[in-house]
Design a protein with these regions (language model features):
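Pre-NBD coupling/linker segments of ABC/ABC-like ATPases
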Residues: 338-351
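Juxtamembrane helix-loop junctions of ABC transporter transmembrane domains
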Residues: 12-20, 43-44, 51-64, 85-132, ...
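Transmembrane helices of ABC transporter permease
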Residues: 33, 37-50, 88, 152-206, ...
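Conserved catalytic Walker-motif region of ABC-type ATPase nucleotide-binding domains
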Residues: 119, 241, 329, 358-360
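An intracellular "coupling" helix at the cytosolic face of ABC transporter transmembrane type-1 domains
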Residues: 33-35, 124-125, 141-150, 154, ...
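Membrane-integrated ABC transporters
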Residues: 1-55, 67-82, 96-104, 117, ...
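Helix-loop-helix
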Residues: 71-73, 77, 170-184, 254, ...
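ABC-type nucleotide-binding domain
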Residues: 349-599
Length: 599
């Protein structure tokens, strides 16, 4: 069960990471709209960096002249100037932090919105290939890694880069000879960054993948909590999750060790270089060829430069992690739905009659290319007609509904609605003409009213209540603590199976669509509720084209026509009595599978 195809392998099967610049360039569309914040941040960055670089000059002045000043006024002015620089630095730093943090939050919000919008619009086949837990990991943990880079990493990186360049120029201006010594160790500092960088990126990507695997396992297990308990698998499932977490921890430990080693080497090399420079400068001061203030100023610039290099090496790890996360996000954004709107869509007539025609339709599921789900399927359903599809499991009944909803497109033939090929219609218009009652009702954590309005947001409370009454759902809804405003819990855990099904039927009634698709809509109801629902469905079916998949004889007998399917083909059709008289597959199903209520 846990060996399902990871999302990370869907779009890009290669294990090697793509270029860091390519991965991070995907962030630009989300950063570009924040130009004003970016400009403000750059201004504050320039002011804070410039102010910081002025501090060593003030220290030099104090060392060389301040303690020799005979005028108290001049001394006070020097220290007031130093305090003034500190005030400017404080304001600029606060402004820089505000701008970059808000920029990061806005960019991240746009990224998450774009990612969720992209995922929710993917076709059904994508979700069948993917693991929900991994998708949630992309939306949460991966974007949080990117947020760490945008919200603080970029700021630290650019501030460190500006300070490094500024300090380098200042060191050359202050003492070219000592600056030359610093230049000699730069290759030694940069070499480990280059060597360790790619390894950190690869481990960062692998670490995110392992966390996504753990999230997928948790999502699957928690969504099936009742089954886990029924089969006594708590310990086994806990062990599976622990193994996934330990795998993620092992990868994270390798990444952390590599990054820690990189930071240690850089700090040793940088501050070793400063020690050498300080030693050389001290010899010049002793020899009288260098003023103490100049050495102090140079050392401060060297410390700034060293801190900047250390900051860059630290942020480099965040850059590599973000590059790995954006690579995963980029793979997801690169996925393309195979079911899309046509370039020049046609429009359905208003009102839509609901006439359907299947013409030599052939279809196989992408996951089962060697097995036809429908084959040479021909069927005409007149406007307002109620047609029941019956047949053994795997006959292709649910496939007919899936193709009508354009969850998939047939590989052969075509399907027409009011004479228009479904592929020539906008998906929103096509699906807006249909109301589906699935075998397992999808109930959300919102209120009862919100669940009923799922297919029709604009419905008034009176319309919601009327639909609930028609579906025999009003009685139990009005018995809830807040009636229609009562939250139903995730997956409708506060409701019975029959209550959830009645909510789904009420939702379809409220949608008021010209086509009604019922996939064993009364399967979870008791006999009394089914009798009430059958009356409601009969009212809902008037003037509408209805396609019913049913295992109950009472449901089938009310249909205008019964279509008997087997192996993806139509093998018989007609009225109940005629099909029973033929004593074929339908008669066998009626005797063995259908539930006869005695009618």
């Amino acid at each position: 069960r846990h060996a399902a195809l990871p999302v990370s392998k869907i779009a890009n099967p290669q294990d090697q990471p793509t270029g860091r610049a390519t991965s991070l360039s995907r962030l630009w569309p989300f950063l570009r709209p924040q130009k004003s914040l970016g400009a403000g941040w750059l201004i504050f960055l320039a002011v804070s960096s410039g102010t910081t670089l002025l501090l060593p000059a003030m220290v030099r002045r104090i060392i060389d002249h301040g303690f020799k000043e005979t005028s108290l006024t001049s001394l006070n002015a020097t220290f007031m100037g130093l305090f003034g620089l500190a005030l400017v630095l404080a304001v600029a730093t606060a402004g820089r932090y505000f701008c970059i943090t808000l920029l990061g939050e806005r960019a991240l919000a746009s990224l998450r919105e774009r990612l969720y919008d992209h995922v929710i619009r993917m076709d059904v086949d994508f979700f069948e290939r993917s693991r929900v837990g991994e998708l949630i990991s992309r939306l949460s943990s991966d974007t949080e890694v990117v947020q760490a880079l945008i919200g603080s990493g970029i700021s630290v990186a650019l501030r460190s880069a500006v300070m490094l360049v500024g300090a380098a120029i200042a060191m050359i201006w202050t003492s070219p000879r000592l600056a030359g010594l610093i230049a000699l160790v730069i290759p030694a500092v940069m070499l480990p960054i280059m060597l360790f960088g790619r390894k950190v990126q690869r481990l960062s990507r692998l670490s995110q993948d392992r966390l996504a695997d753990a999230a997928a396992i948790a999502n699957e297990t928690l969504n099936a909590a009742a089954a886990v308990k029924a089969y006594g698998r708590e310990e086994i499932e806990s062990r599976h999750y622990a193994e996934a977490i330990r795998a993620a921890l092992s990868t994270a430990r390798r990444r952390i060790s590599t990054r820690a080693l990189l930071t240690m080497i850089v700090i040793v090399l940088v501050f070793g270089a400063i020690t050498v420079v300080l030693w050389a400068g001290a010899r010049q001061v002793v020899a009288g060829t260098l003023d103490p203030g100049v050495l102090g100023q140079f050392v401060l610039y060297a410390v700034f430069a060293a801190g900047s290099v250390a900051g860059l090496s630290e942020v480099w790890g965040d850059v590599l992690r973000a590059a790995g996360a954006m690579e995963r996000i980029g793979e997801l954004l690169s996925e393309r739905s195979q079911i899309t709107d046509p370039p020049a869509p046609l429009r359905l007539a208003s009102p839509t009659t609901g006439a359907l025609r299947f013409e030599q339709v052939g279809f196989h599921y992408p996951s089962r290319p060697d097995r036809a789900a429908l084959e040479q399927f021909d069927l005409h359903i007149g406007a307002g007609e109620t047609v029941a599809l019956v047949g053994p499991s795997g006959a292709g009944k649910s496939t007919v509904l899936a193709l009508l909803l354009r969850f998939y497109d047939p590989q052969q033939g075509r399907i027409l609605l009011d004479g228009i090929d479904l592929r020539e219609l906008r998906l929103a218009e096509l699906r807006g003409a249909m109301a589906l009652v699935p075998q397992e009702a999808a109930i959300f954590a919102g209120s009862a009213a919100e669940n009923l309005r799922f297919g029709r947001e604009s419905a008034t409370l009176e319309q919601v209540q009327a639909a609930a009454r028609d579906a025999a759902a009003a009685e139990f809804i009005e018995a809830l603590p807040q009636q229609y405003d009562t939250a139903l819990g995730e997956h409708g855990v506060r409701l019975s199976g029959g209550q959830r099904q009645r909510l789904a039927i009420a939702r379809a009634i409220l949608r008021d669509a010209p086509l009604l698709l019922l996939d064993e809509a009364t399967s979870a109801l008791d006999a009394r509720s089914e009798a009430v629902i059958q009356q409601a469905l009969e009212r809902a079916q008037r003037g509408r084209t209805t396609l019913v998949i049913a295992h109950r004889l009472a449901t089938v007998k009310r249909a205008d026509r019964i279509i008997v399917m087997d192996g993806g083909r139509i093998i018989a059709q007609g009225k109940h009595a005629d099909l029973m008289a033929e004593n074929g597959l339908y008669a066998d199903l009626a005797r063995l599978q259908f539930i006869d209520d005695g009618s």
